[in-house]
């Protein structure tokens, strides 16, 4: 009887902990969104980010580090908050997202605003280009409703800009979302791609990587 009670108490404690982490993350994100950014402070913080994402925010064409330049401020804030709340698995980023590095909500706002104003990458890494018509069809059917016809996303809905992103990074994230490795993935997106094989995801990623920049 005592064992059952103990297990139940542990379970309750774990559930309470998870909800507390999620609430903290949400509060931090909302607080950051309501602050006035300090671009100069954001630029200083970004010097550390540039180690991997480069000074221009264009990452690496092999997809090991994504393009972040020009991404919506809201999306950047959410992803950073998710990563440091461990709601998105990214061990490489963990050391760079702590309060001691970025700061609190104000730090998130500052660096996110700075990154959002960097010019977008005009030439991201691309796939083989063999199935672009099929990729366009799939994109229009599965992706356009949220990400827009030009892949520009929706800042208010936290839908990321995907135009100008590296093919290899896009493909990896699609696979991770499908396979349940992205804990912070949008459930609606998971439902759309959960039955897709790697080839289909690659075709979509290749098309997206080639969407021309909006004029």
Regions found by a protein language model. Give the residues of each.
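Electrostatic cytochrome c docking/interface patches
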Residues: 23-46, 59-64, 113-138
């Amino acid at each position: 009887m005592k064992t059952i009670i103990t297990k139940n108490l542990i379970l309750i404690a774990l559930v309470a902990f998870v909800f507390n982490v999620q609430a903290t993350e949400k509060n931090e994100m909302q607080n950051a969104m309501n602050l006035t950014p300090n671009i100069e402070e954001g630029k200083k913080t970004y010097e550390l980010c540039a180690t991997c994402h480069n000074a221009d925010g264009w990452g690496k064409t092999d997809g090991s580090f994504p393009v972040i330049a020009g991404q919506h401020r809201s999306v950047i804030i959410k992803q950073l908050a998710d990563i440091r709340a461990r709601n998105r698995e990214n061990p490489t980023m963990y050391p760079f997202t702590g309060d001691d590095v970025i700061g609190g909500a104000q730090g998130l706002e500052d660096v996110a605003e700075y990154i959002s104003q960097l010019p977008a990458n005009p030439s991201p890494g691309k796939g083989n280009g063999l199935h672009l018509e099929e990729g366009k069809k799939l994109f229009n059917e599965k992706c356009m409703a949220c990400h827009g016809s030009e892949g520009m996303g929706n800042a208010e809905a936290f839908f990321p800009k995907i135009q100008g992103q590296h093919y290899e990074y896009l493909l990896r994230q699609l696979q991770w979302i499908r396979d349940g490795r992205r804990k912070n993935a949008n459930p609606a997106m998971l439902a759309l791609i959960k039955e897709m094989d790697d080839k289909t995801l690659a075709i979509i990623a290749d098309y997206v990587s080639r969407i021309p920049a909006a004029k």
